[in-house]
Amino acid sequence: MFTLRELPFAKDSMGDFLSPVAFDFHHGKHHQTYVNNLNNLIKGTDFEKSSLFDILTKSSGGVFNNAAQIYNHDFYWDCLSPKATALSDELKGALEKDFGSLEKFKEDFIKSATTLFGSGWNWAAYNLDTQKIEIIQTSNAQTPVTDKKVPLLVVDVWEHAYYIDHKNARPVYLEKFYGHINWHFVSQCYEWAKKEGLGSVDYYINELVHKKA
């Protein structure tokens, strides 16, 4: 059975980006509900003793949706930082190579997240085939992992992620998000992706976030 992971930062540490009340609902209720739903759905099934990575990559329907939403939220929390952090020289070089400049990457990332229709997630992910970083929109619970692409950065654009603090102003939320990216974590993900491929996602989920006894 899975448990809700604690936030990797204090709920009152994000200034005017996200409030403690927003985290109470987003983490304490929405994220918790996905954990509860998954535990109920896998009880008595072949997935009951499976790792979250295995469930994510081998399931479908409601089991997949809830497992993916657990992972997506865990990863999103790790992408956030109370204070600005610096990206590695390696990641900086890759973004400049693949997008032309850091400013162009920001522009493309925010535009993609702004124009995503309905609920979903906006990602930067490492394409193992092309060895390039891509910006990817996914609807609802979908994740690049199922397309064998390694997530590096994500922003949640479900309305429950920003409505409490920013109402329907998604662009305002996204601009503030960009000032709270944990580039140290994103840089680590890029380093892991180049070395271990999808194995880095397996390690992140099963060893760092949801390690089973």
Swiss-Prot record:
GO biological process: cellular response to iron ion
Cofactor: how bound: Binds 1 Fe cation per subunit.
Similarity-based family: Belongs to the iron/manganese superoxide dismutase family.
Reported function: Destroys superoxide anion radicals which are normally produced within the cells and which are toxic to biological systems.
Keywords assigned by UniProt, alphabetized: Iron, Metal-binding, Oxidoreductase
EC class of the enzyme, as a word: oxidoreductase
Residues noted as binding Fe cation in the record, renumbered to the chain: H26, H73, D156, H160
Reaction it catalyzes: 2 superoxide + 2 H(+) = H2O2 + O2
Record-given protein name: Superoxide dismutase [Fe]
Family annotation (SUPFAM superfamilies): Fe,Mn superoxide dismutase (SOD), C-terminal domain, Fe,Mn superoxide dismutase (SOD), N-terminal domain
Gene Ontology molecular function, alphabetical: metal ion binding; superoxide dismutase activity
Gene of this entry: sodB
Cofactor(s) the record lists: Fe cation
Subunit structure: Homodimer.
Disulphide bond pairs: none
PROSITE patterns: SOD_MN
The EC number(s) this enzyme carries: 1.15.1.1
Gene3D superfamilies reported in the protein's UniProt record: Fe,Mn superoxide dismutase (SOD) domain, Iron/manganese superoxide dismutase, C-terminal domain
